[in-house]
Amino acid sequence: KQLIVLESTTYPGTTRELILPILEETGLKVGEDFYLAFSPERIDPGNKFYNTRNTPKIVAGITPKCTEVAKLLYQQVIDTMVPVSSTEAAEVVKLLENTFRSVNIALVNEVAIICNKLKLNVWEVIEAAATKPFGYMTFYPGPGLGGHCLPIDPYYLSWKLRTLNYRARFIELASEINTEMPYFVTNKITDGLNRSRKSVNGSNILVLGVAYKKDINDVRESPALD
């Protein structure tokens, strides 16, 4: 019997509503003739501490037997299994993880804009706030979101919710703020050149860090290219 596992980040319901019907068109029955599960990829490119083996693995099957078979596969190479009750729950787990980062990055990006308006040093504010030992998690502002996950994944969730007549306003606002950050950065550059009586046109501008994060060569969705 074959095991099919979807790892790609996607909207809630994909495994059950899209993949399963295609497989069952063959006349085979899930949980009896084949096993189907969802287990989101959780690799962090460039992370020198967390890797495939020591990053807990979310696993959920269409049936309990599917979950068990998927666990048997992954536990050969991954230390910790985290089974959840349904493929939909597993799909939302990954979306929550990346939406959490997107929303918090949007918050600190807006704080950067606020500090700029108030003529304050945002880095001083963040470092001081980071001394609080509880109830605070440090995020840093930047020119926006990049990579093949964070800029895209929240839209899977907001799209699905729109089909249910609900608008995820908080998530969509975060995406809007992050998308606008490259323009905030270019305006800062323009202002700096203007103070030096130079125009953007004709100026030599060095861009360091074209990839979406340090120590990798992936430029997908990199805000530096905007």
Which ranges hold each PLM region?
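Structural/interface elements that position substrates and couple domains in central-metabolism enzymes
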Residues: 1-226
